[in-house]
C-alpha cells in the first residue's frame, strides 16, 4: 500500500511538474512570439517612417531647382596666357577647377561672359577692347554652365564680326547652351530663349545698359539686347505667355 501510495504521489508530482513545464513553455513561447511580433511591428514602423521621410525628401528635391549665377567672366591677358599657347588648341579647364563641383551640382548654372570670342588666336586682345579665345567657352561648358549671357558693355569690342563669330561658335560647338543677349537677325532678336528643368520652363532675358566702342554705325538694332523700358515690358509680356517663370 505504501508503495502504491508513493507511486501515486510520484505520478501526481510528475503530472504537476509536467503541467508546470508545459505552462512555462507555453508562456515563454507566447512571450517570444509577442516579442517577435512587437519587434517586427517596430521594424515595420521604422521602415515606413524612413520611406515616408525619403519620399518627402524626394518630393522636396523634385520641387526644388538649384540655380547658380556667376560673373563677370572677363579674360585679361594674364588669364588667356595661362594656357599652353604653344598648342593649336588651348585649354582653360584649370580656371574653373575649384568651382566645377558647385557649378555641376546645380540644376541650372548661368555665367555672364563679359568678353566676346574670336576663333583666330591672332585676333585675341585684352583691355580695353577684349577678344577672348573660344576655348574659354569650352572650359565654361566643361565646368557645367548651361546658360551664357553675352549682352554687356564689351559685346561690341570686336565689332559686328565679333558678335556674329561668337554666335556661330556657340551654335556649332555647344548648341545645348542657352545663349542670351546677342543675335544675328531681327527674327532671332524677336524670339524669347527658354530652358526647361524638372518640368518647369524658364524664359531667359539678358540686357546691357551700354555698349563700348562708339560710334555704333555698324551695330544693327537687333544685334544686342539693350536695356530699354519699352522693349523689356514687351519681352516680359511675351515671356510670361510661353513659360512658367521669367
Q: Which residues fall in each region the model found?
A:
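N-terminal targeting leaders characterized by basic, low-complexity, disordered sequences
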Residues: 1-2
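Acidic, metal/ion-coordinating pockets
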Residues: 7-246
Amino acid at each position: 500500500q505504501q508503495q502504491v501510495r508513493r507511486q501515486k504521489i510520484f505520478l501526481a508530482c510528475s503530472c504537476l511538474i509536467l503541467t508546470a513545464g508545459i505552462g512555462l513553455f507555453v508562456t515563454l513561447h507566447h512571450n517570444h512570439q509577442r516579442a517577435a511580433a512587437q519587434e517586427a511591428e517596430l521594424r515595420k514602423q521604422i521602415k515606413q517612417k524612413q520611406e515616408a521621410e525619403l519620399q518627402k525628401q524626394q518630393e522636396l528635391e523634385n520641387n526644388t531647382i538649384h540655380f547658380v549665377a556667376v560673373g563677370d567672366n572677363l579674360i585679361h591677358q594674364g588669364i588667356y596666357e595661362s594656357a599652353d599657347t604653344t598648342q593649336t588648341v588651348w585649354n582653360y579647364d584649370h580656371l574653373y577647377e575649384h568651382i566645377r563641383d558647385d557649378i555641376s551640382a546645380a540644376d541650372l548654372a548661368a555665367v555672364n561672359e563679359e568678353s566676346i570670342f574670336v576663333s583666330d588666336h591672332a585676333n585675341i586682345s585684352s583691355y580695353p577692347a577684349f577678344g577672348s579665345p573660344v576655348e574659354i567657352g569650352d572650359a565654361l561648358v566643361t565646368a557645367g554652365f548651361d546658360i551664357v549671357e553675352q549682352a554687356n558693355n564689351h559685346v561690341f569690342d570686336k565689332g559686328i564680326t565679333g558678335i556674329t563669330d561668337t554666335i556661330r561658335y556657340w551654335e556649332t560647338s555647344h548648341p545645348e547652351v542657352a545663349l542670351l543677349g546677342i543675335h544675328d537677325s531681327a527674327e532671332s532678336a524677336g524670339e524669347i530663349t527658354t530652358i526647361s528643368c524638372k518640368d518647369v520652363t524658364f524664359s531667359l532675358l539678358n540686357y546691357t545698359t551700354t555698349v563700348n566702342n562708339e560710334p555704333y554705325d555698324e551695330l544693327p538694332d537687333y544685334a544686342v539686347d539693350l536695356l530699354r523700358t519699352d522693349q523689356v515690358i514687351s519681352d516680359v509680356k511675351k515671356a510670361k505667355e510661353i513659360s512658367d517663370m521669367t
